[in-house]
Amino acid sequence: MDEPLFSCVLPCAKGSEQVLQQEAEQLGVQTLSIAPAVVRGKASLLTFYRLCLWSRTASRVLLVLAHENVDSAEAIYEVARNIAWEDHIAPDDTFAVRFNGLGCGIRNTQFGALKIKDAVVDRLRDIVKRRPDVDAKTPDILLDAHLHKNELTLALDLSGGSLHERGYRQAHGAAPMKETLAATLLYRARWHEFCAQPATLIDPTCGAGTLVLEAAMMAADYAPNLQRQHWGFTRWQNHRPALWNKVIDEAQTRKNAGIAALSDYVFYGYDQNPVVIAAARANAKRLGLEDFVHFAPKRLEDLTADFGARGFVVANPPYGERLGEVQELIPTYAALGHWFKTLPADWEMAVIASNDALLKRMRLRAHKYYQAFNGTIAAQIVHYRRSEQPESQETAAQQKLAQASVGISEQAQMFANRLQKNIQKIRPSAERAQTDAYRIYDQDMPEYAVAIDCYGDAVVIQEYAPPKTIDPQKAQQRLFDVLQVVPEVLALDERSVFLKTRQRQTGKTQYNPAAEKRNEERIVYEGAARFLVNLSDYLDTGLFLDHRPMRRLLFEQAAGKRVLNLFCYTATASVQAALGGASYTTSVDLSPTYLDWAQRNFDLNALSDRHRLQRADVMAWLHSGKSQFDMIFCDPPTFSNTKKEQRVFDVQRDQIALIDGCMQRLAAGGILYFSNNYRGFRLEEALCARYCVQEISENTIDFDFKRRPKIHRVWKIMHRSDGEQSAEK
């Protein structure tokens, strides 16, 4: 006699519907329809068991008990009460209701679940004179209710919870990939067909190993849910243990045979984080696959092509949605594409990513694209074949941009041309200035609102935050144009390009380091000086390029003088004064981070101990002593917080107190160089009356800042008697 068929609903991730339909039909489901995130059909109890054990892509397996039109909360109650719950739930069982949807008087899902719970309890109390208890966390029976428009579907959740919880992954990384999505990726890329013959599989960004382990299970004919300990049918009144055990035994037999054949396969998972590698190894051990799957800490950039003639690459690299800024991931995607092109012709690759611009950075020709969702994140699964990659593409990508066929826009080509012209003009000036740290571009084209600074063999791109009126997608595309063009025009490795977003700073954020320090340090030169710069961890690099002329002026005038540097930052001005022969220098700043950096700059230039670093609030320090100086350089921030003194410094408001304090420390015949970069700054007339003041800003703008002459302003200030005597001479 034929087994009776029941209506089934198989929820899944959006984008997985067709894969799940094919899988369900192979397991015995008679498919009726597919819709976004769900497959519906008919199935026998045996097929339901097989779905629970063998479906790699379904989120849940639901057996429908009722599907009715409703128009009110009371109608929902009546539909639920008319179900013969006594045939499904024993009086001693616990149950819970999961409700999705709104409408028909249901304003929140808790109320919808309560109406169904009341109907179940009322029915059982009337029929069997007892009511079951509710257990929201680990119920024996889990009911699933879905309300869409006026249609209510009420079902038993035979899976007892999401089927991505296979039971083997108890440790994972920061952004784990669901096992069901991993299986979808593998099906989309036809891994289940590829692995019909022995092969090698590699995940170069494996995290806790989900993709590798799902691929190994697929190759071994290993039922994905064989490790699960909890099901939603074990206490169900219609459960048939003998039939279920038969399904389990069959799966165990297939698994044993499949694992025996795995010795002809090789599975590798790599990640630069040793913590997640340890988690991946533990997950493999729970599956009994530790002898066949090899996890090791390794950077993507360090991978070789020595993995055999035939194989498959799978990757779920960071998307840039939550794990980091998109621009920081460009080297990762570029390295992935470059490495894949070093593999033999019979290799294939499947990548899931959410950002099309990042995928383009791999410079690969896609075989097929598939839409997918990783949780709420819209993504793409892209299938590549090594044999379909033009052999000439890599060479073209490395040629000059003007000859390269890299698919950039006409506007991006104009930006590249401008950059080329700037470099040809600026580099000779930099050589004459004896420096390898200089600016080559600063918003020359309004569409590309960035500044580009060279630091030896590296580049820092500073993106000016676009106004809210600019379409964010257009702004991002222009940024990608910049990030694509710069390394090619300058012939740099993309890992030597650093991006920072410059926006209006607040007192609390202007000096904040990056969330995760990378410590990308370089040594640059400026005349006789050597400076340490950090290109990755702070908004500024430790060297203000626009003040190069001021540092040169201090070097030229410092011989035999006592020099004071206020708000000294990393004390690069003090270093130049010391190299220029200053009798001694004193550098004052409140930041221990920058004073440590300053000490490293002094050490780098082999300067003696007579050059003093002082941690102090500048305003308080000026009024706490009487020592005199022949030359003072004061370059305050526009504003800053001073926790210890419980005040906020504002350069416009506090300029008189600051300059008066400096002049009290300035010896007769001395010079104060006062500078700031606040564009709205106005020097108080009282200061001009009190001292001899001369603005010298025009003389402090060097070759690489001629396009932006208002980047800072500088005044030469002397005691009036000294200034008048100087003028007479």
From Swiss-Prot:
PROSITE patterns, A to Z: THUMP
Reactions listed under catalytic activity: guanosine(2445) in 23S rRNA + S-adenosyl-L-methionine = N(2)-methylguanosine(2445) in 23S rRNA + S-adenosyl-L-homocysteine + H(+); guanosine(2069) in 23S rRNA + S-adenosyl-L-methionine = N(2)-methylguanosine(2069) in 23S rRNA + S-adenosyl-L-homocysteine + H(+)
Origin: domain of life: Bacteria
Entry keyword Flavoprotein: no
Pfam families: Methyltrans_SAM (PF10672), RlmL_1st (PF22020), THUMP (PF02926), UPF0020 (PF01170)
Keywords: Cytoplasm, Methyltransferase, RNA-binding, rRNA processing, S-adenosyl-L-methionine, Transferase
Domain THUMP: from-to ranges: 47-158
Enzyme class: transferase
Major subcellular location class: cytoplasm
Subcellular location: Cytoplasm
EC number(s) from the headed UniProt entry: 2.1.1.173, 2.1.1.264
Annotated InterPro entries: 23SrRNA_methyltr_KL, DNA_methylase_N6_adenine_CS, RlmKL-like_Mtase, RlmL_1st, SAM-dep_methyl-trfase, SAM-dependent_MTases_sf, THUMP_dom
Keyword Methyltransferase on entry: yes
Gene Ontology cellular component list: cytoplasm
Molecular functions per Gene Ontology: 23S rRNA (guanine(2445)-N(2))-methyltransferase activity; RNA binding; rRNA (guanine-N7-)-methyltransferase activity
Function as written in the Swiss-Prot or TrEMBL entry: Specifically methylates the guanine in position 2445 (m2G2445) and the guanine in position 2069 (m7G2069) of 23S rRNA.
Family, similarity comment: Belongs to the methyltransferase superfamily. RlmKL family.
NCBIfam families, alphabetized: PRK11783.1
Record's protein name: Ribosomal RNA large subunit methyltransferase K/L
